A protein has these predicted regions:
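Short loop-to-alpha-helix "cap/lid" segments that border enzyme active sites
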Residues: 1-99, 103-126
Length: 126
């Protein structure tokens, strides 16, 4: 999945790739889906991307609410939150339905997943 914060850059990439590569929503597309979801008008959203990669909050507004996760999933979009380093926050977002978490602490993530009953992940040797 290719991601960029810049809408024109992402749109140029989509065009250059013939829309054959999955992309994450840029700022404008993310903002539209978040606002429409908050207003209960998410049925009007028609994002071009296959995912959201977002923080849990921005400018004091929560982005980790159930309707946004549901709206993304209804559109076959993955939703990834960044940067999550706290085990309780990891657990909460997994239970919310996040498809991925970006973390600086894979050791904590691994232990959190183990505690939630996920199968052990083998670490490749270096």
């Amino acid at each position: 999945m290719v991601a960029s914060f810049d809408d024109p850059t992402l749109e140029a990439f989509r065009h250059a790739s013939g829309h054959s590569v999955s992309t994450s929503a840029a700022v404008g597309e993310t903002r539209n889906l978040v606002i429409l979801s908050r207003l209960g008008l998410d049925r009007l959203a028609s994002p071009k991307s296959q995912g959201l990669q977002i923080p849990v909050a921005k400018y004091g507004y929560a982005l980790d609410f159930p309707r946004l996760v549901h709206s993304a999933h209804q559109r076959n979009m993955a939703i990834h939150y960044w940067t999550i380093n706290d085990p309780a926050e990891m657990q909460r977002l997994i239970r919310l339905g996040a498809d991925g978490l970006i973390t600086d602490r894979p050791d904590i993530m691994r232990e959190t997943l183990r505690r939630l009953g996920y199968p052990e992940i083998e670490t490749p040797e270096r």
